Amino acid sequence: MATVDDILTGKYPAKSHARRVAQLLQAHHGQGAPGVIYLEAQKTRLIEDNDEPMPFRQRRFFYYLSGCSLPDSYLIYDINADKLTLFIPPIDAEEVIWSGLPLSADEAMKLYDVDCVLAATEVNATLRSIGSAYGGNAVAFAIADQVSSGAEFQGFAETKLSVLKEAIEKARVVKDEYEIALLRKANDISAKAHIAAIRASKTAVNEREIEGAFIATCIAHGAREQSYHPIVACGANGATLHYGKNDDDLTDPATKQRKNNILIDAGGEYRAYCSDITRVFPLGGSFTKETRQIYEIVLQMQLECIAMLKGDVQWEDVHAHAHRVAIKGLLALGILSGSEDELFEKRISVAFFPHGLGHYLGMDTHDTGGNPNYGDKDTMFKYLRVRGRLPVGSVITVEPGIYFCRFIIDPYTQSPELGKYINTTVLERYWMVGGVRIEDNIHITKDGHENLTTAPKAIEEMESLAL
C-alpha cells in the first residue's frame, strides 16, 4: 500500500479534476456546443498605502484545476479537445533583480498535471484560436468577479459566468486519493503541533506562547500557513466559539491560581489543504472534577457520532444523536432535569451545544458543497453547515462541544417556559469550565469511515502530556 509521501511525490491530479468539472457542467447544462473553462489565479496585490505585498492565498477554484500556487496565472481547459493549458507570468528582467528567476515553462510542465504551459501574455491569443477553431459556436465558462477586464472572449457564442463556480464546488466535495493524502499530511503535522502546544503550556504564562508553539511546529514540518486563525482559549474563554484574542494570562488575577484548562482549535494547511482539530487539556496536569465530567460527555458524543458515519448517512441524524448524548450526560450531572425526550423536543441542549456538529473539509476549512440552511427556524439545525447525506469520499469534521456561556444560557434559565429544565444551583459549579470541544477530521468510506486525525484525545493521554 502506497504511503502518503509516495502518493504526494506524484503530480496533483489537475487534469482529472478538470474532467470531473466538465462532466458536471455537461450533465447540468447540456452536451451541445463545445466549451472551455477559463480561470484566473489570485493577483499580486499590495497592502493599502504600502509597497509590501499582501499575504498571498491562491484562489481555490483555480488551484483545483491546476495545482498551481503561482499568482497572476491563468488556466484554459478545452473540454472537447481535453486539453488543459496553464499560463504563467513571463520573465520580468527588473523583477528578477529582486526576486530571482521565476518558474520556467519547462519547469512548470514537470511540476503540474497540464498539457501545455504558455506565458500569461498568450491567454487572449489562445482564446481567439479556440473560438475560431469551433467556428464561433463554443461556450466559455468562467466565474463572475474573477475575470480580468483585459480578458477577451472573441469568437465565442456565449460566456456563462453563473454555473462554473457551482460545478467546482460540487466536484470538490468528493476527494480523490491524492487529496486524502494531502489532508492526512496536514493532520499529521497538526497533531505534532497540538502536542507541542500542550508541552509549551507547562511553562507558558500567556495564551500567545501556546499559539506560537503550535504555529512554529507547523512551519517546521512544512505547513507554512494556518487553515484559519488559531483559537487558544484558557478557562472561561473557551465558552466563546471563535475566540481569537489569544492574549490572556493563564493565571487568574483574582485567585493567583492557574486557570483550569485550555481549548485549542487549530490546524495547519499543507499545499492548500486544511486540517481542523480541537483539543482541550488541563493546565497543571489534571482536569478538575467538573471539567473531567464535561470532557467525558463530549468525548462520548464524538465517539458515538463517528461510529455512525458511512457513505449515505443522513448528517442531520448524526447531529441529532450528539444532542441526545449531551442531554443524557447533563441529566446525569443534575444540570438538566426532565425526561430525555422532553428536553430534546424543547431543544434545551442547544443552550449548551449551539453550533453544528461539523462541516466539510478540504481546500477551505469550511469547505464547499454543504448546502446549509441558516434560515432554518429549528434552533437545533440552524447552524448545521452540512445538510443531507454524506457521499463516499467526502471529508467532514466531527466536533461536538458543551459550553458554559452566560450570554447563551441565561435566556433559557430566565424563560418561564424553559427555565425549569436547568438547575442553576448545579450549573453554578460549571461556569469556569468554559467550553469543551473535541474535533477530528473523518474520511467517509462506503462501509464506514477513516479518522485522519492522530492527535491524542483520551483523558489519560491529555493529562500525561500536560503533566
From Swiss-Prot:
InterPro entries: Aminopep_P_N, Creatin/AminoP/Spt16_N, Creatinase/aminopeptidase-like, Pept_M24, X-Pro_dipept-like. The keyword Metal-binding applies. Its EC number is 3.4.11.9. It comes from the Eukaryota. SUPFAM superfamilies: Creatinase/aminopeptidase, Creatinase/prolidase N-terminal domain. GO terms for molecular function: manganese ion binding; metalloaminopeptidase activity. Pfam families: AMP_N, Peptidase_M24. GO terms for biological process: proteolysis. It catalyses: Release of any N-terminal amino acid, including proline, that is linked to proline, even from a dipeptide or tripeptide. The keyword tRNA processing does not apply. Binds 2 manganese ions per subunit. Mn(2+) 2 binds at residues 265, 276, 439. Its cofactor is Mn(2+). Keywords: Aminopeptidase, Hydrolase, Manganese, Metal-binding, Metalloprotease, Protease. Mn(2+) 1 binds at residues 276, 399, 439. Belongs to the peptidase M24B family. Catalyzes the removal of a penultimate prolyl residue from the N-termini of peptides. This is Probable Xaa-Pro aminopeptidase pepP. It comes from Aspergillus flavus (strain ATCC 200026 / FGSC A1120 / IAM 13836 / NRRL 3357 / JCM 12722 / SRRC 167). The gene is pepP.
